[in-house]
Amino acid sequence: MKRAFIMVLDSFGIGATEDAERFGDVGADTLGHIAEACAKGEADNGRKGPLNLPNLTRLGLAKAHEGSTGFIPAGMDGNAEVIGAYAWAHEMSSGKDTPSGHWEIAGVPVLFEWGYFSDHENSFPQELLDKLVERANLPGYLGNCHSSGTVILDQLGEEHMKTGKPIFYTSADSVFQIACHEETFGLDKLYKLCEIAREELTNGGYNIGRVIARPFIGDKAGNFQRTGNRHDLAVEPPAPTVLQKLVDEKHGQVVSVGKIADIYANCGITKKVKATGLDALFDATIKEMKEAGDNTIVFTNFVDFDSSWGHRRDVAGYAAGLELFDRRLPELMSLLRDDDILILTADHGCDPTWTGTDHTREHIPVLVYGPKVKPGSLGHRETFADIGQTLAKYFGTSDMEYGKAMF
């Protein structure tokens, strides 16, 4: 029986890549800088002391970081027994965004350039804005700028509630984001607006990767909160992923937990499970692992590392999240059968000590564990697509165009 379980710790980079200078990210190191802050006692907010990740360390995390950067993260045990196979992987894709990272993991790197809204003020073309106002019958719009999602709610949330004007904003990523209040504007209305925006961006040739619905609740600035009803409308991958091949060639099953289905525009996904927060995502993953049959992938994205702590530059929060993940990791490992493989990885970096609020161009960890997986180093991987090619070989699908099987 062949089953694979892929866990993406969204944004969990392990050191800047060789081409980081092109992105302004030389020296970025999500894991290393979190560990350094913890070791210095600078991340003692609800948790305390050095970063404590014994289970991830046993799977090779500290060694993968050493391969990427040349050193073991502060406070982590470089001499611990390693029971898994580990690697550090470079991104072939042209960006450092979520779709590029995930698609490349599944064997389809993004070799074209995404479109971006690079102006920090008046970010969107007037023609696009006019079409959205007309088609969605809007009273106008707010924002039209680059912003952090939480900052813009404090700035414009109250005005949005009074006027009914949606908040449009973007970032350094290829995204068009729309924030609206779940109660005063309505969730269904927000989703419909996002569908219209997706159509206009596609038809207009803007080449924008994602439209993201950002619903929130609350009654005034300072207590607005984004909810778990986020929805991403992505373009489809430019070629069949290993997920699609498993479904088409092996009549397999691919279970999305969290936002995976959105990232792949539902391509190659046979079941979608919604969950919000690390514990709920873990619980849903465990349930699906227990029910998984032959030729099945259970694919989970743990988005909180990125959205709650990476972008918000919350070192202590990120550290606490990693420690929670590590504590629960044995629950996943205990469910593995003889031929199963568990892959822990990431899609990009988002160093919470870095300037700004955007992603960072970093190597990702590739930690592989299973009863039949030989422990030890798998070395430096030239592309995330090595994961996809490994899965193609494991399940016996046709080869992917990119990547080399790791074993």
From Swiss-Prot:
Pfam families: Metalloenzyme. Transmembrane segments: none annotated. The keyword Metal-binding applies. Pathway: Carbohydrate degradation; 2-deoxy-D-ribose 1-phosphate degradation; D-glyceraldehyde 3-phosphate and acetaldehyde from 2-deoxy-alpha-D-ribose 1-phosphate: step 1/2. It comes from the Bacteria. Keywords: Cytoplasm, Isomerase, Manganese, Metal-binding. The keyword Secreted does not apply. It is an enzyme of class 5 (isomerase). Binds 2 manganese ions. It catalyses: 2-deoxy-alpha-D-ribose 1-phosphate = 2-deoxy-D-ribose 5-phosphate; alpha-D-ribose 1-phosphate = D-ribose 5-phosphate. Mn(2+) 1 binds at residues 10, 347-348. One of its GO terms (cellular component) is cytosol. Its EC number is 5.4.2.7. It is found in: Cytoplasm. Mn(2+) 2 binds at residues 306, 311, 359. Belongs to the phosphopentomutase family. This is Phosphopentomutase. It comes from Escherichia coli O127:H6 (strain E2348/69 / EPEC). The lineage of its organism: Bacteria, Pseudomonadati, Pseudomonadota, Gammaproteobacteria, Enterobacterales. The gene is deoB.
